[in-house]
């Protein structure tokens, strides 16, 4: 460079190293993202990731299947993007982390769609064919939506619960749990939807407010003498009266068969204008007020003394068909919070009622069960036959009144069970169903299903940790699992049952395997068309095909069997490392998967469970059509970019509710721009840098460059620890701070002078570029799991010879000698710089200086601050971005200060520094000596910055 002096002539404009990059400032995301999606598919990027990951330890995130019905909504986007971030971050952490997406394909919602389109009278074979076609069409539609969000996975070979192999394996799983002795058939009250005409799983029930009649009903004394003795009386002072119950379901009264009292609650005999009334003593005052009566307690007794007393059915006077009595059974579940402390018991329509009546010797055939599957009473029911239970409610109230049994009738607003699909009220209804027994021991002995599942919960890692207690409580308190459904489009419970006894065929296990083989070839349709004689010969005279299908929660709940160890066993493995779903899946997929794996394997199918919250608007309200506050992910992707949705999800603490609004998206977009601008600066300043030829070893870097790389490496270690625990929002927060403050607000700000004004190939500039290269290598990789489109776009500019960033692992930064001490020193220097910046700002406000380069500063410092500042020598001015800087030692911290003065020297046209040597070379009157040297001689020497 020394021979340049000969060529030096005055120039109209002196060159600086201002470089450009094909990485644009504007992301133009809605236009460019779909091109990346196409590019990834065309070049087989997912397959390349798999090839690059081969032989590494596996990490399996098992996809909880969305239902193959309808467009994807924001909740889907949250779920799929979180999964994508987990999978990408695990791949980059050095695992082989495949992602096989899946779909739940059977069940009611699809049947409803087929009914809507084609009516209810289609033959079964046509329902099946149309349901398969519909599910396929929905899957393709959803698949496009998921890919548009930047989610990479095995889209060409997803799992579907309706694939023949999966259907067959599900039947085999059923065979296994029968073999282990968990399955039984019984009459039991189950959640029943009249519109579905089927039992519902717990997860298919939601609660909504509704108003129902609330009535207090008198059951007249049937055994007055025994009642008197129970109360310690010789006889009752009068014959009229009885025991009083309170209910919000008048429709259950025709099926009443018992009364429940708490053994330890004290019951009172109250003398009133309506006769003698029996109720809990602590409810007397409230009830008298409600009934408009005055009453006097004449005797008291604990509930246990009233056990087995009988009272007349309250409709006995209305119709001879109700001339029966109801016995008193004791139950610990009776409370005195509301009502009378007496519960009327219709065992066909309440779980506790059923359990209590069965415990007192009632058989299935004794149970009165007049409500049919469509919600109507059987025709033979006295007074109300043929009516729906809802239409019958007011008529039952009228009949009770006419019979003299009604004490009070009001309307009552309460939270009540509804079908999640039809949004209509449901009931408990005793039906003959197939169950998995929660308190059943397996055939070979050992722990019950409930005990095994609770142990499995204890052995599982939960993110966030409160999920453990929630799932534990659900398993501890849940009833037996109703496995059967009364539908067509579902995997059959392919049993042959005895026409008279209902017993399973003795060869059931062998027959299930035969059916599974046929289903493997032809799908579940094979069972529909099967003639029983083909498999059981003349036994077909005694046995018939069971018509029930499996609960769809069994379909998805056995994917650990028919996907992880079935259709996709080559890609996946059991148990999965992680299941990741919304918090509603504690009673849904997490729950059913846990129960099936506990039955099949005696353990959970997952090592960890991650739960995310639901989306709400900016005011914390749930998204709903009525509020009009829903946000469509397609619309946001097409307007702002899927990257903005991804960044919003990554930056939100998903363990709670995820708030979204236009204001929030605006803030996210601004945050995105800051990151993008940082990347653009890095790429532009590396555009003339070839690492192989131009990089310097760390020992030759300037001190601030060593600090920057040491700091970036330390930050990366923190980020990877967050990634390992699936904590994304701290990753985003720290990276945004890194880009805006550590890089933009400090390091890159200091670096600009050296990058722009040093000779292009000078050691000072190459030192800066080498550091920037390492920072960019690291930064793009830690951004890639959530800013996938942007990281890939930047990577193609940065490393054009590389196929994709997603085959990379996290960057191994070069070792920096004394990194810890270096970071501590520069943290101190940045602290001082903050004080100087403040002083410069005050001087600017007072119009003493224009830009900071117009200033010369004197920093008075003590102790370690002085040592750190003094060690920079003349380079201190570059760190403070002033034209001159001196440091003066003082003894005490209290004497420290920053003095700012305006420079009296002229301004260099090229570097904008105010220097005494501007114009020192007559041929270049507007250049300072530093710029002259950098342009025409050997260039300035720097050591620190």
From Swiss-Prot:
GO biological process, alphabetically ordered: isoleucyl-tRNA aminoacylation
GO molecular function: aminoacyl-tRNA deacylase activity; ATP binding; isoleucine-tRNA ligase activity; tRNA binding; zinc ion binding
EC number(s) on file: 6.1.1.5
Sequence motif 'KMSKS' region, location on chain: 622-626
UniProt motif 'HIGH' region: location: 66-76
The record's free-text note on cofactor binding: Binds 1 zinc ion per subunit.
PROSITE patterns the record matches: AA_TRNA_LIGASE_I (PS00178)
Signal sequence, start to end: none
Binding site residues for L-isoleucyl-5'-AMP: 581
Places the protein is found: Cytoplasm
Residues the entry annotates as binding ATP: 625
Main location: cytoplasm
CC annotations in GO: cytosol
Record keywords: Aminoacyl-tRNA synthetase, ATP-binding, Cytoplasm, Ligase, Metal-binding, Nucleotide-binding, Protein biosynthesis, Zinc
Binding site for Zn(2+): 908, 911, 928, 931
Cofactor entry: Zn(2+)
Catalytic reaction(s) noted: tRNA(Ile) + L-isoleucine + ATP = L-isoleucyl-tRNA(Ile) + AMP + diphosphate
Record note on domains: IleRS has two distinct active sites: one for aminoacylation and one for editing. The misactivated valine is translocated from the active site to the editing site, which sterically excludes the correctly activated isoleucine. The single editing site contains two valyl binding pockets, one specific for each substrate (Val-AMP or Val-tRNA(Ile)).
Family the entry assigns: Belongs to the class-I aminoacyl-tRNA synthetase family. IleS type 1 subfamily.
Role: Catalyzes the attachment of isoleucine to tRNA(Ile). As IleRS can inadvertently accommodate and process structurally similar amino acids such as valine, to avoid such errors it has two additional distinct tRNA(Ile)-dependent editing activities. One activity is designated as 'pretransfer' editing and involves the hydrolysis of activated Val-AMP. The other activity is designated 'posttransfer' editing and involves deacylation of mischarged Val-tRNA(Ile).
NCBIfam families: ileS
Record's subunit section: Monomer.
Identification of the protein by name: Isoleucine--tRNA ligase 1
Protein's organism: Burkholderia mallei (strain ATCC 23344)
Organism classification: Bacteria, Pseudomonadati, Pseudomonadota, Betaproteobacteria, Burkholderiales
């Amino acid at each position: 460079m020394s021979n340049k002096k000969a060529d030096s002539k005055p120039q109209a404009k002196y060159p600086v190293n201002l470089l450009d990059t094909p990485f644009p400032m504007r992301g133009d995301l809605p236009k460019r993202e779909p091109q990346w999606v196409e590019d990834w598919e065309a070049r087989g990027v997912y397959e390349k990731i798999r090839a690059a990951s081969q032989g590494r330890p596996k990490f399996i995130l098992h996809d909880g299947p969305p239902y193959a019905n309808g467009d994807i909504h924001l909740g889907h986007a949250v779920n799929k993007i979180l999964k994508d971030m987990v999978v990408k971050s695990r791949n980059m952490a050095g695992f082989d982390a495949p992602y096989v997406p899946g779909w739940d394909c059977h069940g009611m919602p699809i049947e409803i769609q087929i009914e809507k389109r084609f009516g209810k009278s289609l033959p079964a074979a046509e329902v099946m064919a149309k349901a398969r076609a519909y599910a396929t069409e929905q899957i393709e539609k959803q698949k496009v939506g998921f890919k548009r969000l930047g989610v990479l996975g095995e889209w060409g070979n997803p799992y579907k619960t309706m694939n023949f192999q999966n259907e067959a394996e599900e039947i085999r799983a059923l065979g296994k749990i029968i073999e282990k002795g968990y399955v039984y058939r019984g009459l039991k009250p189950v959640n029943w939807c009249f519109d579905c005409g089927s039992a519902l799983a717990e997860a298919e029930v939601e609660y909504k407010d509704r108003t129902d009649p609330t009535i207090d009903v008198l059951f007249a004394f049937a055994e007055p003498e025994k009642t008197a003795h129970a109360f310690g009386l010789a006889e009752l002072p009068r014959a009229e009266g009885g025991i009083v119950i309170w209910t919000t379901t008048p429709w259950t009264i025709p099926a009443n068969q018992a009364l429940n009292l708490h053994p330890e609650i004290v019951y009172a005999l109250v003398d009133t204008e309506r006769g003698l009334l029996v109720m809990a003593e602590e409810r007397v005052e409230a009830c008298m007020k409600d009934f408009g009566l005055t009453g006097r307690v004449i005797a008291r007794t604990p509930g246990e003394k009233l056990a087995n007393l009988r009272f007349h059915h309250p409709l006995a006077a209305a119709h001879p068909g109700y001339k029966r009595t109801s016995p008193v059974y004791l139950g610990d579940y009776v409370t005195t919070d509301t009502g009378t402390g007496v519960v009327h018991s219709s065992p066909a329509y309440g779980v506790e009622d059923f359990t209590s009546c069965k415990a007192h010797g009632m058989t299935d055939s004794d149970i009165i069960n007049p409500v049919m599957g469509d919600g109507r009473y059987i025709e033979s029911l006295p007074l109300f036959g043929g009516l729906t239970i809802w239409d019958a409610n007011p008529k039952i109230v009228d009949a009770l009144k006419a019979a003299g049994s009604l004490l009070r009738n009001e309307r009552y607003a309460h939270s009540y069970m509804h079908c999640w699909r039809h949004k209509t009220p449901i009931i408990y209804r005793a039906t003959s169903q197939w169950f998995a027994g929660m308190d059943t021991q397996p055939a070979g002995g050992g722990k019950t299903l409930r005990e095994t599942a609770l142990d499995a919960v204890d052995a599982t890692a939960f993110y966030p940790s409160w999920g453990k207690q929630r799932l534990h409580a659900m398993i501890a308190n849940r009833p037996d699992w109703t496995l059967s459904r009364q539908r067509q489009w579902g995997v059959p419970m392919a049993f042959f049952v005895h026409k008279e006894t209902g017993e399973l065929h003795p060869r059931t296990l062998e027959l299930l395997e035969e059916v599974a083989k046929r289903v493997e070839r032809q799908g579940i349709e094979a069972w529909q068309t099967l003639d029983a004689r083909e498999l059981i010969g003349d036994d077909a005279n005694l046995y018939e095909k069971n018509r029930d299908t499996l609960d769809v929660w069994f379909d998805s709940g056995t994917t650990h069997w028919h996907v992880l160890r079935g259709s996709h066993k080559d890609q996946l493995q059991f148990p999965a490392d992680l299941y990741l779903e919304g918090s509603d899946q504690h009673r849904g997929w997490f729950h059913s998967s846990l129960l099936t794996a506990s039955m099949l394997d005696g353990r959970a199918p997952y090592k960890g469970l991650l739960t995310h919250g639901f989306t709400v608007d900016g005011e914390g309200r749930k998204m709903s059509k009525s509020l009009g506050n829903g946000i469509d992910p397609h619309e946001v992707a097409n307007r702002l970019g899927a990257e903005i949705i991804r960044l919003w999800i990554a930056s939100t603490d998903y363990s709670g509710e995820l708030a979204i609004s236009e204001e929030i998206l605006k803030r996210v977009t601004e945050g995105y721009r800051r990151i993008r601008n940082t990347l653009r600066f890095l790429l532009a300043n590396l555009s003339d840098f070839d690492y192989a030829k131009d990089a310097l070893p760390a020992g030759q870097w300037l001190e601030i460059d060593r600090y920057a790389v040491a700091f970036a490496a330390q930050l990366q270690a923190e980020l990877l620890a967050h990634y390992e625990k699936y904590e994304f929002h701290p990753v985003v927060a720290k990276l945004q701070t890194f880009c805006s403050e550590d890089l933009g607000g400090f390091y890159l700000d200091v670096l600009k002078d050296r990058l722009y004004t040093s000779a292009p190939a000078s050691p000072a500039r190459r030192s800066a570029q080498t550091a920037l290269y390492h920072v960019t290598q690291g930064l793009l990789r830690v951004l890639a799991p959530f800013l996938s489109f942007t990281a890939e776009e930047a990577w193609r500019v940065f490393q054009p010879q590389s196929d994709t960033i997603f085959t990379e692992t996290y960057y191994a930064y070069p070792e920096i000698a004394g990194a810890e001490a270096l970071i501590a020193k520069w943290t101190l220097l940045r602290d001082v710089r903050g004080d100087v910046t403040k002083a410069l700002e005050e001087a600017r406000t007072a119009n003493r200086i224009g830009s900071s380069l117009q200033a010369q500063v004197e920093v008075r410092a003590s102790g370690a601050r002085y040592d750190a500042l003094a060690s920079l020598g003349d380079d201190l001015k570059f760190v403070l971005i002033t034209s001159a800087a001196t440091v003066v030692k003082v003894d005490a911290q209290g004497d420290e200060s920053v003095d700012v003065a305006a420079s009296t020297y002229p301004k260099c046209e090229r570097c904008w520094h105010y220097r005494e040597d501007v114009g020192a070379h007559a041929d270049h009157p507007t250049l300072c000596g530093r710029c002259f040297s950098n342009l025409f001689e050997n260039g300035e020497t720097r050591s620190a910055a």
